[in-house]
């Protein structure tokens, strides 16, 4: 699973005006950034080797960059958190997200230099691994 698959899934929720990957100078309000998690996570492999794995884990950071209202930002953050947390067997391009496990609760990180409130969700996206032909 690629970060772009997660970005497309988050965009399909229809909760933000824009969903992006990577740096976005002069971010408009009501956007969600999707990043690879910078936290360290232990490597796991199935007993018997990677060929026997039925699922994989993609750790992602979601940055909610909303507006100058803390109340509206928190409401949008909770909506995103719940939508992600409740996802089950969700298609994302050519992948299937089996479920999403938040690493911790919704985090308020204050405002950016423009006074726009931001919140962060760290989550593990558990996705199905199949016998797909490798390109």
Annotate the PLM regions.
Residues 44, 71-73, 130-134:
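Intrinsically disordered, low-complexity acidic/polar segments
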Residues 24, 38-40, 67-69, 126-130:
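Generic structural motif
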Residues 52-58, 97-100:
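A short glycine/small-residue-enriched secondary-structure motif
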Residues 49-54, 112-114:
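Short, solvent-exposed beta-strand/turn "edge" segments of beta-rich domains on protein surfaces
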Residues 65-89:
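Mid-chain, well-packed structural core segment of small domains
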Residues 1-49, 87-91, 134-135:
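Small/polar-rich, solvent-exposed N-terminal microdomains that initiate assembly or binding
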Residues 85-129:
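Acidic-leaning, charged glycine-interspersed low-complexity segments
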């Amino acid at each position: 699973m690629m970060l772009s698959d997660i970005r497309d899934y988050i965009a399909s929720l229809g909760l933000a005006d824009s969903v992006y990957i990577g740096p976005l100078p002069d971010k408009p309000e009501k956007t969600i950034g999707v990043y690879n998690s910078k936290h360290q996570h232990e490597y796991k492999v199935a007993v018997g080797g990677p060929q026997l794995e039925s699922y994989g884990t993609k750790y992602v950071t979601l940055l909610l960059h909303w507006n100058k209202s803390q109340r509206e930002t928190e409401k949008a953050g909770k909506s995103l958190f719940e939508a992600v947390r409740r996802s089950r067997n969700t298609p994302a391009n050519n992948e299937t997200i089996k479920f999403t496990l938040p690493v911790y609760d919704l985090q308020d990180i204050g405002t950016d230099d423009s006074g726009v409130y931001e919140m962060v969700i760290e989550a593990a996206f558990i996705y199905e691994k199949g016998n797909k032909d490798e390109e």
